[in-house]
Amino acid sequence: EVKLLESGGGLVQPGGSLKLSCAASGFDFSRYWMSWVRQAPGKGLEWIGEINPDSSTINYTPSLKDKFIISRDNAKNTLYLQMSKVRSEDTALYYCARLGYYGYFDVWGAGTTVTVSSE
């Protein structure tokens, strides 16, 4: 069974950092481009960025490229999202997704929730 499982979400204070993980199984992770996508409460999906199979190319949405770092470990079949300098606007459900051969996301995880709050 092809699966993606995100983890690492939780409550983080404004200005803080958090590292999300996405464990892949059931397919050859090292052959696929992978992406992170998020959905803030009451809003649509927002693409964060993508990484190619050997990590030589990493693309970000311009507004997030100075805050977020995408990486991967093919030996561990795991994708990462390092978040820094988080703000309340970063509160969202964060998904990892596999980019299929036909140019669309063909496998999604269930997501992990990140809440940015000082309370």
Swiss-Prot record:
GO cellular component, one term: immunoglobulin complex
Record flagged with keyword Methyltransferase: no
This protein's record includes keyword Phosphoprotein: no
Swiss-Prot/TrEMBL keywords: Adaptive immunity, Immunity, Immunoglobulin
CDD domains linked to this entry: IgV_H (cd04981)
Signal peptide annotation: none
Domain of life per record: Eukaryota
Gene3D superfamilies: Immunoglobulins
InterPro entries linked: Ig-like_dom (IPR007110), Ig-like_dom_sf (IPR036179), Ig-like_fold (IPR013783), Ig_sub (IPR003599), Ig_V-set (IPR013106), IgHV (IPR050199)
Swiss-Prot/TrEMBL GO biological process terms: adaptive immune response
Domain Ig-like: 1-112
Other observations noted: This chain was isolated from an IgA myeloma protein that binds galactan.
Protein known as: Ig heavy chain V region T601
Species of provenance: Mus musculus
